[in-house]
Amino acid sequence: MARSFVDRELFGLALAALAIAACAKDPGYKNAGTGGGQLGGLGGTGGGGGGQPADSCADPQPWSEPAAPAACADTAPAASGAVGATIAVDAGAAVGAWNRFYEKAVAVDHAHTLICTNYGRNAANALRKAHAQAGFQYARFHGIFNEDIGVYREDASGVPIYDWSRLDAVYDAVVAAGMRPFVEVSFTPNALASDPSQVQKLLWYNQISPNISPPTGAADDWGKWGALMTAFVQHIEERYGADEVRASWYFEVWNEPSWMYGPGDGGYWELYKNTVTGLLQGDPGLRVGGPAGSAGETPSMIRMLITGALNSGTKLDFVTYHRYGDDNGLPVADVKDAVAFHASVQDIVNTTVAKNMKFTGEVINNEFGPSWMPDISRDNEVAASYIAKMIHLLGTDPTVPAPAAYGYWAVSDLYEEIYTGTASAYRPGNYGLMLKGDPKIPESFDVAKPSFNAFRLLHMLGDQQLGVTGGTAGDGVGAAATRSSDGSAVQVLVYNHVDGGAADSSAAITVSLTLNNLPFTGPIRVRQYIVDRGHANSYRAWLAMGQPPRPTQAQWVTLRDAAELCYYETTATPAGGTWTATFPQSIYGVALFEIRAAN
């Protein structure tokens, strides 16, 4: 989440009130926060894990690898009218490595989502699909120390009791998906909270809002918090391997500290310092960072964190921030402002703060999307071109270092952060890359949105970046080109994005694409994949069937099929290593051309 704190808090209070009123009448609701395994024994010895908690609701069928795209059933769209944009690619020489920073991380709402949600499904298979088809490597989520995970409580004498059973189930799901946790250390267990009433109602998880007050209510609470951090590290290293956790996991302290602290407040520094101390007592080699600031708080928080760390010698390996397409009152899906914001963060890190004490850690945005709140742009084709343009500009600007990761929020509509009690199987405007589906209809599970298909196209790009010229200045057509490291294929990604999400997506620009110095002799095979208003678009298919809130099984099959990528295939014989094509590029559309030798 990432607009102003006041806007978010007021909106969250209103939604929480609606949710509580609607919950009892909602047949799709399941309170996943009350079940689970037994708490462990005294003194931090309990809850060894193993098996699924009692409140698990995994999909009934085993996971299977998704099928590769097939040929489209219709013919490719034909260009008409004058050429509005030209693109030229030099396929003969790489200009550098293609940066896959956008595959580093994706979000999964809150931790319990990977065990169960109010809807009767969990997000584990969505995570598997995200890794298999889009290449995502890390999963980040809120609330690993929330009450619904149940890690921490105390006996009558105040002795800590740890139960790792649900925590294990969460991280096991991440690892089973072929991914790693990007650990967000949040929030405060009720038994350690300094203010039991200080909950963040915007994060309304199964009637359990997390406590965001720091653990400083009693003299020994920082000690207990630090001991919890140390025990946490010791446990996960025993379960997943010390070398693996130390070398490959990230540990991020908190999420959007402005919920608790003002821009000039040193409270977050105390939280960071004490949390990191506890984590590093478990293993001094861990990778630690923060502050995961929203757009408004990021500059001051990052300055404070880097300055404090460098002056005190406190470990800080990376800094994180959040930025959405409509932050600061902008219309949705604004790319240019988000790109400029990343440049400003890099400036803070590399110049403003550093000066004589250079910070060399990673800079990561682990929450981005076309909007900070639910919006229809997240379901339709607008998100697809927004993602493509964002990644292209961030990854190819020679004047600003690309982020180490740029994580989309979030992987699935199995999402409870702003749950209003509706039991609709298709609730438009939600955050996910995939629809939540109907728990009774397997054909409905994890149907892709255009946004997810944009990431699939990005995943199909090669490892070596090629030089590209042309396109339109500012809004409109842009392109990135790559080739496979073994020279077997050349890929060109073309998008047409207009900031604001309000342009007519049925309109198109005729594009002339020329590839020079192709490394193939003889005929070539060209496959064109399209994501736009009329291709790989479950939302437009849903509109066409009358917007049913609970699609039938047959309708879900239609939606699933409409969401799938397909390709148009042609063959050609380049003249002197040059191939040219003319095609229509829809506004808010993305196309990928894959060129290989025909034999």
Predicted regions mapped to residue ranges:
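Aromatic/acidic polysaccharide-binding cleft in carbohydrate-active enzymes
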Residues: 367-500, 504-506
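C-terminal beta-strand-rich structural cap/linker in extracellular carbohydrate-active enzymes
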Residues: 550-599
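Glycoside hydrolase catalytic-domain groove-lining segments
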Residues: 126, 326-376, 401-409
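Ser/Thr-rich, Pro/Gly/Ala-heavy low-complexity intrinsically disordered linkers and tails
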Residues: 2-5, 16-80
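Surface-exposed intrinsically disordered loops and tails
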Residues: 57-75, 116-122, 153-161, 194-220, ...
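N-terminal carbohydrate-binding accessory modules
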Residues: 57-135, 277
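Carbohydrate-binding surface patches
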Residues: 474-542, 588-594
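Substrate-binding cleft and catalytic face of glycoside hydrolase catalytic domains
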Residues: 134-336, 347, 351
